[in-house]
């Protein structure tokens, strides 16, 4: 590799930053026809702007949803007229987005690149400038900073866009490239991870709320699929089943405490407390209903017994009145018999003169 690059002579810069990029990438395997310098710079700027955004699996879903052709991926020849600035800008472009290096699969025109560069000011992507930031860090670690004339016009455009993004959406903060899967996808399809491709940083919460639209399924739909924060996943694929639907009221009441505790293993403490309070409320409600039913039933029984006793009292009263009438009849008959017998026998001293004698 060093012998191949030595052929170019003084075409390559000798700064530590440029040599670092030369050692990292094999430039001889990219055989792409050279394009004009102005178009190269515009396309490289657009490539850096869209490097950290959400990329879909379809190449041409949006004007800047895919990577434009590399400006100069062929090794510099001694007779080429390109200067050192162009090569340094190409290195910035390569580190910003290394995951798609096949420029022939995409037909990206300079007009699309200019339009994407203009639209990038309306949709700031703070995570799109990792390559530029890494370049600055490497330059500082090497013991010197790259002058402004070596960085070229593309770096100035990148700095201006970074300032515009910071003014519109606050200071951009960068996340580590941890692939947090979403907890709730569109149809339980595995969730669209934050890191859409290696080398692209996930957007901040402010940019994700602005650009995160569309359902992020397993294959990635449009240009902005599944950008929401992973901890705010919706209720998909059966993971957030509410326990009110799992246990009916009758099951909660009739289930034993041991069985309920076995069913609630792995459930949060708040959910367990809420379910047990609901079970206690249902039990108290059932106990109150049973007591109310028993009271009503006992009242009906007592009322029926009272009616029976009243009927018996009426019957006894009727019996008493009948017996009184019979007594009066017998008494009257007796008095008649006593008066008739006294007249027949006459009055004598042996016979008593009063009817009490015969009694």
UniProtKB/Swiss-Prot annotation:
Gene Ontology molecular function, alphabetical: DNA-binding transcription activator activity, RNA polymerase II-specific; DNA-binding transcription factor activity, RNA polymerase II-specific; identical protein binding; RNA polymerase II cis-regulatory region sequence-specific DNA binding
InterPro entries linked to this entry: bZIP, bZIP_Maf, bZIP_sf, Maf_TF_N, TF_DNA-bd_sf, Transcription_factor_Maf_fam
Annotated segments matching region Leucine-zipper: 302-323
Ranges of biased composition (kind: Gly residues): 184-193, 212-226
Cellular compartments annotated: Nucleus
Region (Basic motif) residue spans: 274-299
Comp. bias regions, Low complexity: 194-211
Family matches, as Pfam families: bZIP_Maf, Maf_N
Composition bias type Basic residues, residue spans: 173-183
Ranges where the bZIP domain occurs: 274-337
Keywords in alphabetical order: Activator, DNA-binding, Nucleus, Repressor, Transcription, Transcription regulation
Keyword Acyltransferase listed: no
Keyword tRNA processing: no
Broad class of where this protein is predominantly found: nucleus
Tissues in which the UniProt entry reports expression: Expressed in kidney, brain, lung, gut, mesenterium, testis and ovary.
Example GO BP: lens fiber cell differentiation
GO CC terms: cytoplasm; nucleus; RNA polymerase II transcription regulator complex
Region entry Disordered, spans: 57-85, 169-243, 340-359
Domain remark from Swiss-Prot or TrEMBL: The basic region and the leucine zipper structure are necessary for association with HOXD12 and PRRX1.
Family as reported in the entry's similarity comment: Belongs to the bZIP family. Maf subfamily.
Protein task: Acts as a transcriptional activator or repressor. Positively regulates the expression of alpha A crystallin genes during lens fiber cell differentiation. Binds to Maf recognition elements (MARE).
Quaternary structure and interacting proteins, as annotated: Homodimer or heterodimer. Binds DNA as a homodimer or a heterodimer. Interacts with HOXD12, PAX6 and PRRX1; interaction is direct and inhibits its DNA-binding and transactivating activity.
Name of the protein described by the UniProt record: Transcription factor Maf
Organism: Gallus gallus (Chicken)
């Amino acid at each position: 590799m060093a012998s191949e690059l030595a052929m170019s002579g003084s075409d390559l810069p000798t700064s530590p930053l440029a040599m670092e990029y030369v050692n990292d990438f094999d430039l001889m395997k990219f055989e792409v026809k050279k394009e004009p310098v102005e178009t190269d710079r515009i396309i490289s700027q657009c490539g850096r702007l869209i490097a950290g955004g959400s990329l879909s699996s379809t190449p041409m879903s949006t004007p800047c949803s895919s990577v434009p052709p590399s400006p100069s991926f062929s090794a510099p020849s001694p007779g080429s007229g390109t200067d050192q600035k162009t090569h340094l800008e190409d290195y910035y472009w390569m580190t910003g987005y290394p995951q798609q290096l096949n420029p022939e699969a995409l037909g990206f025109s300079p007009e699309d690149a200019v339009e994407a560069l203009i639209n990038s000011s309306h949709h700031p992507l703070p995570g799109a400038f990792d390559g530029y930031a890494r370049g600055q860090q490497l330059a500082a670690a090497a013991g010197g900073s790259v002058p402004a004339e070596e960085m070229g016009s593309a770096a100035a455009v990148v700095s201006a866009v970074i300032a515009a993004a910071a003014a519109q959406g606050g200071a951009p903060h960068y996340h580590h490239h941890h692939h947090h899967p979403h907890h709730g996808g569109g149809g339980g399809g595995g969730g669209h991870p934050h890191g859409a491709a290696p080398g692209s940083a996930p957007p901040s919460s402010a940019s994700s709320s602005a650009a995160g639209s569309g359902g992020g399924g397993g294959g990635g739909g449009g240009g902005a699929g599944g950008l929401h924060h992973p901890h705010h996943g919706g209720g998909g694929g059966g993971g957030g089943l509410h326990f009110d639907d799992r246990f009916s009221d009758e099951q909660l009441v009739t289930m034993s405490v041991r069985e309920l505790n076995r069913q609630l293993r792995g459930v949060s403490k708040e959910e367990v407390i809420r379910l047990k309070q609901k079970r206690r409320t249902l039990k108290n409600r059932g106990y109150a209903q049973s007591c109310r039913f028993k009271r009503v039933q006992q009242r009906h029984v007592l009322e029926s017994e009272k009616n029976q006793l009243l009927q018996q009292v009426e019957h006894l009263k009727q019996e008493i009145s009948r017996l009184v009438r019979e007594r009066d009849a017998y008494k009257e008959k007796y008095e008649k018999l006593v008066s008739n017998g006294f007249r027949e026998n006459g009055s004598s001293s042996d016979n008593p003169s009063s009817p009490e004698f015969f009694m």
